[in-house]
Amino acid sequence: MINTKILDGSYTLRTALAGDAAGMEFVQATCFPTLHASELMNRDHFSNHIKLFSEGQLVVEKDGQIVGAASTLRCFFPEHEHTFMESCDNLWITRAHKPDGDWMYGFDMGVLPEHRGLGLSKELYKARHQVCKALGLTAQIIAGMTIGYGKVKDTMTIEEYCERLGRNEFTDPTITPQIRAGFRWIKPMYNYINDPESGNASILMYYPVDEKFFIGQ
């Protein structure tokens, strides 16, 4: 269980409890306004995540309000192409979560807009890293949404955007902070998610517990 004060004690980062599901639902709906409704998680989904893998569900709280949340499951390294809905068993994780899996798949993270820019997402990644270490897992794996594509979608394809992003020709408001937090690029995942502003794409990345570990070794 994680329960720690962060940012000079003004926020609490902790393992999610059953009573947090409604607050997590609010964070989800607020943070992903362009995501198709069929891919938005609700309190019932979050309740199931907490029931199945409580250690992997985290929240950030301030003055009694949930202002950030992160959802994960355990799995084996995904060798094949997959979609967001496939990765999390249509949001429920019941069949996707493998209790003996050696990777942590982070399939959701959000921080309310008025609390962004303070490093809360980085704190959540650090906490997930702590959970990975405690459970003896290999790494976190995520599919970061290419949020920045929406601003340039009239000037380039999503494929070109990902190629240029991978060459560090520009930054992305989601992918760049994730890389700065320690994640390593694997590959773009096209048609991964139903979000036109992201070009329906995400970047598959991993953050190993042992920094000497590299995929393909």
Locations of regions flagged by a protein language model:
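A short beta-loop-alpha structural element at the N-terminal edge
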Residues: Y11-M24
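Helix-loop element at the rim of GNAT/NAT acetyltransferase active sites that forms part
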Residues: T15, F26-M41, H49, K212
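Conserved acyl-donor/pantetheine-binding loop and adjacent beta-alpha core of acyl/acetyltransferases
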Residues: A70-D108, K126, I142, T146-P173, ...
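Conserved acetyl-CoA-binding loop-helix of GNAT-fold acetyltransferases
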Residues: V111, G117-C132, A139-I142
